Amino acid sequence: MSLEDSLRSLSLDYLNLLINGQAFSDVTFSVEGRLVHAHRCILAARSLFFRKFFCGGSDPSASSGLIDQTGVRVNPSGSPRSSNGVLVIPVNSVGYEVFLLLLQFLYSGQVSIVPQKHEARPNCGERGCWHTHCSSAVDLALDTLAAARYFGVEQLALLTQKQLASMVEKASIEDVMKVLLASRKQDMQQLWTTCSHLVAKSGLPPEVLAKHLPIEIVAKIEELRLKSSIARRSMMPHHHHHHHPHDLNAAADLEDQKIRRMRRALDSSDVELVKLMVMGEGLNLDEALALHYAVENCSREVAKALLELGAADVNYPAGPAGKTPLHIAAEMVSPDMVAVLLDHHADPNVRTVDNVTPLDILRTLTSDFLFKGAIPGLTHIEPNKLRLCLELVQSAALVLSREEGNANNNPPSSTTTTLPMYHHPMNDDHNSSSSSGNNHNIGNLNLDSRLVYLNLGATVGSGQMSDDHGGRHGDPAMYHHSHHDY
């Protein structure tokens, strides 16, 4: 047996004492109404905080005591005792799960800060989540970090910081901002640097950041963006290196002003002004995340008009997660936005950094409805809209797959014509014969989509999925080419 194995074995011996509960226990903590049995000698040996606490001294400043959320100090000599005479000490400063993690580390020097995979967590609505970088995992790590700092267990604090630094690389921007705030509050410079750069790269404008972060942090993020912009310009092979720094500052401010003007124009449905900015001022719609903004904040008509300018990439990935406008429309459960994006050749199979497609998002939301019903966080979603979104994206993926298969089997000739392949079923103006032809080519919904269709309890009404001229119900899997504008 190696030295490392021997040390690990000794650590597990201590951990077994904690797991076995009352065996040789001489102190009991009450956390969230649950009793945790422990051993004063081990806690005092591993933690200066507990050593001072158990010593108890007459001077409150000399003995930290256990402090609850109201700031009341608990004196061990005055604490109640259990039936067998063991001290029962109330702990209100941390939760039960975090307190157990803290004790596990004190007993063994080892701990896993990631929640159990696939278990239901309060801040994670995704079934089957591995909890590696979701909101629940980030919250647990932040709580553990706060507890480690509170109880003075610096080794655990360092371990948790490394864990968080790994998590934020794949976490949502909202969670990154939470970690950013914690790193500033607890003066963790390395974690601050990592998170601030991720927020700076997110593309979120200052007015959005200001809703989540203090104004001084927003100012630092903008300063980082400015430095990054200057660095990029200095690497460009042109002759403008002699420009004064304040000229570069002015250029960066000008870009920010352009983006703000563009968003105001989109908010007021003035796409013509956006067009003038593209043609006359060189506005880059992709870098300004114009389409992402329009999908999330504007009407379908504005998004459609923006796409028809031909200056925006419908599949442009944004932020650390690499979400496209179609990902955002899927998360919003907006059939209108999904339809207009697919009509302009949005890729239904495009993946984020985490390999998530728009179809994955809709399937996850659908399974949540089927297995959980309306749950907190999903109450704003209408089942009919969710069904339509799922059908649109599934059928678009099916058409794309078949076209790719046909292209591989039959190399295109010089006379081949490419047509738009997606069409919103609610706006179909073709006659019955056209629909029948397309139905023969595309086929029916697959079994998965039919199950979703039935389970959500939605029926296709004549006002939703019918042919306007022929008067018959349209196949929900049909996405015809339309010769008219929406």
Curated annotation (Swiss-Prot):
Gene3D superfamilies the record matches: Ankyrin repeat-containing domain, Potassium Channel Kv1.1, Chain A
Role summary: May act as a substrate-specific adapter of an E3 ubiquitin-protein ligase complex (CUL3-RBX1-BTB) which mediates the ubiquitination and subsequent proteasomal degradation of target proteins. Transcriptional co-regulator involved in promoting the fate and determination of leaf and flower meristems. Required for the abscission of senescent organs, probably by regulating the cell wall disorganization in abscission zones (AZs, e.g. pulvini at the base of leaves).
Annotated ANK repeat ranges: 257-286, 287-316, 321-350, 354-388
Assembly and binders: Homodimer.
Biased composition (Low complexity): 406-418, 432-442
Tissue specificity as recorded in UniProt: Expressed in xylem vessels and parenchyma cells of pedicel vascular tissue in the abscission zone (AZ). Accumulates in developing root nodules and present in roots, especially in the upper part.
Designated name of the protein: BTB/POZ domain and ankyrin repeat-containing protein BOP
Keyword check for Phosphoprotein: no
Biased composition, class Basic and acidic residues, residue ranges: 466-475
Organism, scientific name: Lupinus luteus
Disordered: annotated span: 403-442, 464-486
Record remark on domains: The BTB/POZ domain mediates the interaction with some component of ubiquitin ligase complexes.
Protein origin, superkingdom: Eukaryota
GO BP: floral organ abscission; induced systemic resistance, jasmonic acid mediated signaling pathway; nodulation; regulation of DNA-templated transcription
One GO location term (cellular component): nucleus
Domain BTB residues, every copy: 25-115
Keyword terms: ANK repeat, Cell membrane, Cytoplasm, Membrane, Metal-binding, Nodulation, Nucleus, Repeat, Ubl conjugation pathway, Zinc, Zinc-finger
One function term, GO molecular function aspect: transcription cis-regulatory region binding
Primary localization: nucleus
Entry-linked InterPro entries: Ankyrin_rpt, Ankyrin_rpt-contain_sf, BTB/POZ_dom, NPR5/6, NPR_central_dom, SKP1/BTB/POZ_sf
Induction (record text): Accumulates in the floral abscission zone (AZ) upon senescence onset (i.e. at the base of pedicel following flower removal).
One Pfam family it belongs to: BTB
Record-stated family: Belongs to the plant 'ANKYRIN-BTB/POZ' family. 'NOOT-BOP-COCH-like' (NBCL) subfamily.
Membrane-topology descriptor: Peripheral membrane protein
